[in-house]
Each structure stands twice: as C-alpha cells, then as structure tokens.
Amino acid sequence: MNRNRMIRVMIAAIATMAVVMGIIVGCGPEWGDGAADSGAARTAANGGTRNAVSVTLPSYYAKNMVFQRGKSITVKGAATATDGSNITGKQLTATIIQGESSDSATARIGKNGTFSCSIKAQKASLKPYSLMLSYNGSIVYQLSRVYVGDVFVAAGQSNMELNYTQYYSTKDVAYNFGNGLITERDLPRQLVDSNVHFVIADHVAGGTSADAKTGSKTSDDFPLVSAYNESSSWLSANNHDSRHLSYLAQQFAMQLRAKHPNVPIGIIQTAWGGTPISRHLRGGDIYANHIAPLRGFHVAGVLWYQGCNDAMRSAMAMEYETNMTALINQYRTVFGQEDLPFLYVQLARWPNYQYTQDVRFAQLRTLNNVGLRNTSNVGMTVSIDTDKGTSALIHPLGKDILGARMAAQYLAMTEDSDNDGASGNGSTGSKASRNIPSGPIISSARHAGSDGADNGSTNNRNGSSAGNGTNGNTDNGTIVLTFRNGTDNGLKAMKPNYSKTASATVPNYAKHPKATPLDGISHVATNTSQALQGFEVADGSGKWVSVNATIKGNQVVLSSANENLGGMTQVRYLWSGNPSCSSILYNKLGLPASPFIAVVD
C-alpha cells in the first residue's frame, strides 16, 4: 500500500470511528436517518461533550440530496453553543466520505453563528456518500446518504410545475383534462427511477429578511412541500412520489439518465403556477424564498417555462425581454457560474391571451440580448408544434417532446458533439456553444437586390434591423429571409402533426451511442410538398397580407402575385397566439423555426 493510499484509509477509519462513537454516546442523530428534525431545518446537537454545539443546515440539506458533480460542495449553516458559551472563531470540519475515500474542509464560525466551507469536487456515483460535520473531534451533524450527480432547477409557472398530484387529481380535474379533450392515458409517462431525487419548494409568499448582497428581501430558509417534510429527505422518483414532480422535469431527467446511466439526477423544483416573471426576479417573493436561499449551491443548469401570465397585458409583454435577460443574469449569479446552462421553452400555442406572440418574440430576442453578461449556453426550445392537438388547453400535452429537445440542447452545451444544427445563441466562443440544436432563427429580411449583409443579430420590432444593409434595387418585388448561421442547414417544409400520435421516447444508446434525444422524437412532423404558410408582410400603413414563401438553399424568398413587395417594411411569421398552418419551416434536425417579426431592409 503506497503512502497516499495509507493516509486515505487512515482518514476514513478515523471518521468512521468518530461516527460510531457519536452514536454510542448519543451525541448525534440516528445513523441512516439524517440529522434530527427541527422544524424547517435539520439540526443535530452534541449534547454530552465540552463546548457542545447545535448545528443547523438549510432545509434542503437532507438525505437523498444530490450535490453537483465536478463542482465544489458547499456546506453552510449556523452553529450555537448548547451551554451558551462563545464559539465565535471556532472551527467546524465538514467531511464527505465514500468507502475509503474522504475529503474535508474547515469552516470558521462567525459572530452571528453562521459558517460556510467548500469541499473539493467529487465524482458522480450511484453509490451514496456520507456527509458529516464535527466539532472538537465529535460528530455534531451527519447525513448518511447523499449523492453526487447533475442537479437542475426547474423554475417558472404552471407548465413547468405541472404534475399529477396538483393538476390531475384535484377538484379542477375537469378543467385540467379539458372536459374530455385528454384522459389520464394521454398524460406523459411517469418517471420511475430510484436514481432521480427531487425536492419541491412550497408556495410561500413574502420575504422575511434582507439579502446583504442585493438589498432585496429574502427568506432565511427554503420552504418545502408537505410531501418532503413527511419523509425528511429528498423524494425519489418512484411510483408514488413521482406524482409530485414536474412532468417536464421528469421527461428531461429521463433523457439524461438514459444517456448517462451512472449519473444520478437531482431536481430542485421552484416553479409556481399563475405567476408573472417579476415575482421570480430579484425583489420578487419567489426569488426571495425559492432562489436566494440556494445561493452558493452548485447546479448543472436551470430549466425555465414561464410567460403565459405576462401575455395578459401589453405592458408586461413589452417588458418581458428585459426581465428575462435580467433573470438569466441573476440566476447565474446565485449559482456562481457566468455560463451556467439556461434552457427555456418558448410559449406554446394557446388562443386566450392577446399578447402571446409578443412574449414569444421577447423570448426569441433574449437569446442574443446585449444585456446578457454571457450569451453562451442559453437555449430556447420552440414549442409551436408540440401540443399534440391540445392547444385549447393552457397546459397542453407534449412535455415528452419538450423534454427531449431541452435535453439535446443541454448535452450539446456540456459535451463534445458533432451535430449539424446548431447555435441558437449566436456565440462563437466554444464548440459546445456553436452546436446547440435549434430550429431556424431569423437573422435578416431584405428586399432582393439590396446590398445588405447579415450581422448575426435578431431583428426587433421598433425599427432597428438584423441586417446592416440599406434599401437597394427592389424591382423584382421579392424579400429574402436569412437565418442564423448553423440553424439554416437543410431548410424544408414540414407538416406538424397536431395529434396524440406525436411522441418522444428515449433512444437506445447501447445500439446507437452517437444518438441524441432528438432521435427519439417521432411523428411530430412529416415532410410535405405543400408551400410554406404563415408568412405575412406589411407596408407603412400596417396592413398585413399573406405572401408566398419558397425555400432556396438556406434562405426563404417571399413573393406575391397580387402585391408589389417593394414597398413592404415588415415581415412576420406565425404571428398568432394559436397558429394552425399545415406547412411550416423546419431544418435538417427536424426542429421548427421560431415565430418572429422583422423589419425589412
């Protein structure tokens, strides 16, 4: 046995002996049950030793929790002396153990009793670790079963929160099933996987203390739903408990687990139905209670589906791009990573709010907003073709398709890939950023013959343009649309399948190791020879007329037998809350183009 291995064995042996002694003298919680329960937080007291302390960690530190692989493990909390003595400046030691291996870090107790330390990053493993804190050589807190894998925050409103317990087994069952439009048989396949663990934030409004860094009100702890408190642990995705978890998060996790079967998945669900984005931003109560308490806890990425409430009023829709940009920046700050993967869903078809298309466009423009501190690893999933014919429902079907598309984006962001579709965010800094699977994203609209060149930014609605050219020869009366580089490969017309036969399953990676989650999507759309639909143009009067659209290479050319397009100043595509076209634009990945509105140069 070499010297380094001998040292590791000795450390593990000493730690194990300390745990055993803690159990024997009754100075720690029962082994296997995590720390003793004390209200919302979990505490453990070393009641029989000199200078004994009681330690409290945040409520989401509990057995079955998942720490992020490849990143340092933050251990934070508060300590008080049980005999009232002053322990300011004293040290706690945090240790994580698996088998013969262990790593430790020390934390100095501050004046207010708080402490924080970081243990070095650990490898993903289906085998549990143990986490313990010691003071003066005695165990004062321990969790016997924690995991290291990939952790995601599932945030937003009801289409992210949507789960069986809250939405399909309640008094509103008729509303949620659309009075027979769907049945339980149509709901997404439930995830049953003991290596997926999750915790859900309870709906608690109002902040309770000031965040020193931001000045906004934040909660001291993370509120948890009753299902969590009953078990005092993160729930596992079994037949019973998966009913509480977001369907979209389940489908996303299902895809990642198939791709990486030796990596556990953790989900922290903070979504809250019926909420505007402002409540999720710094200064809002959801940010205060659900996001700020996670500061310093490392995650693999954020999953976001929200915007319906902001489509109710024009003012909210017009502010959405600014708010969405701020939210991405703020969440990345909380989790300590400037290029943290942030995956969000563009609003699905739904006819009932007037400004749905405006929010969709704001979501599109966020991808390349100059306010983003880092445009890498920001991905938008277009959902215009995923509802399986249930667009009359505010919670449409299709979460399996969305989960597969989001998983494909995440894997492209975090792994070396060689896919051909690509960047929805315009970044050219890294291979992963260039290869984020995306449908066609509008880059420029110009009159044929104009001497314009694409500068890679998205058109906006107030007169600025994606192209940097000027009006030129418009004699032929056609308009040429170009799409962002990489998203324009293999443009084609496809007919969306708005029926329940559309689906997404998990690819067989054993047989096809180079497959992606997109390969499991089937019957969502089929090739068609029918002309593209959904394109409209307008002149200065603001009158919109439909036009013909023809694919020519990696461009779309607009023309009209009845209208002279030379004087047209705007173009838009699928500009409706609930478009129902039978031939829409896709690329070679089978991903649909985002709806848009653009100024014509």
Regions found by a protein language model. Give the residues of each.
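Bacterial N-terminal signal peptides
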Residues: 12-23
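N-terminal Sec signal peptide cleavage junction
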Residues: 27-29
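Cell-envelope and extracellular/periplasmic
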Residues: 33-34, 39-456, 463, 467-601
